[in-house]
Regions:
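An N-terminal, well-structured beta->alpha segment
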Residues: 1-62, 66-67, 144-162
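Generic, ordered loop/turn and secondary-structure boundary motif
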Residues: 6-7, 12-16, 20, 77, ...
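Short, surface-exposed linear patches
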Residues: 27-30, 65-68, 94, 116-120, ...
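Ferredoxin-reductase
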Residues: 38-114
């Protein structure tokens, strides 16, 4: 595990080098464990259109569910839609898989507890959980939801462009 993937505001690295399937699964276990320690029982999960995002989405979701956290899978979406989904579904948090503005060989994970993105020492706690292998165990559920039209309706009702 490359400790440098645990950045200030996200977990980010180079696809297949830093972010391989084994690491992404362990990250899912760490996110689920961290979430449960903060009374999070349900999280939304979204991804961008990068080539690696779909596979990472499936793997990290499997890890999170293995801790007992339930997933609301919103699939392919923009990052603001992930934030919207947390409030819309009254979820306890969310995870967005996105490379953001970084080069195509990068990808990353933005993690929210409640509506707030974790950062700093909170991100480092994920690393410590992986290093100690002290993961929660359980059986979380997974349900698919499409929020695209709901998000668009919300924007049309609340954004006034003149």
């Amino acid at each position: 595990m490359n400790p440098e993937v645990f950045r200030e505001y996200d977990v980010r690295g180079i696809v297949d080098r830093d972010l391989n399937p084994e690491f992404v699964y362990l990250l899912g276990l760490a996110i689920g464990t961290y979430a449960l320690r903060h009374n999070v029982r349900q999280m939304t999960l979204g991804r961008d259109c990068r080539l690696s995002s779909e596979a990472y989405h499936d793997i990290v979701g499997r890890g999170i569910r293995a801790t007992g956290v339930d997933i609301i899978d919103i699939g392919l979406c923009a990052t603001p839609m992930l934030y919207f989904s947390i409030r819309h579904f009254q979820a306890d948090g969310g995870i967005m898989i996105t490379g953001s503005h970084n080069p195509p060989d990068f990808n990353g994970f933005k993690i929210c507890i409640g509506p707030d993105t974790i950062y700093g020492d909170q991100i480092q706690e994920l690393r410590r959980i992986i290093e100690s292998s002290s993961f929660a165990t359980g059986e979380g559920t997974d349900r698919q939801e499409d929020i695209t039209s709901t998000y668009q309706d919300y924007l049309f009702r609340h954004v006034d462009i003149k």
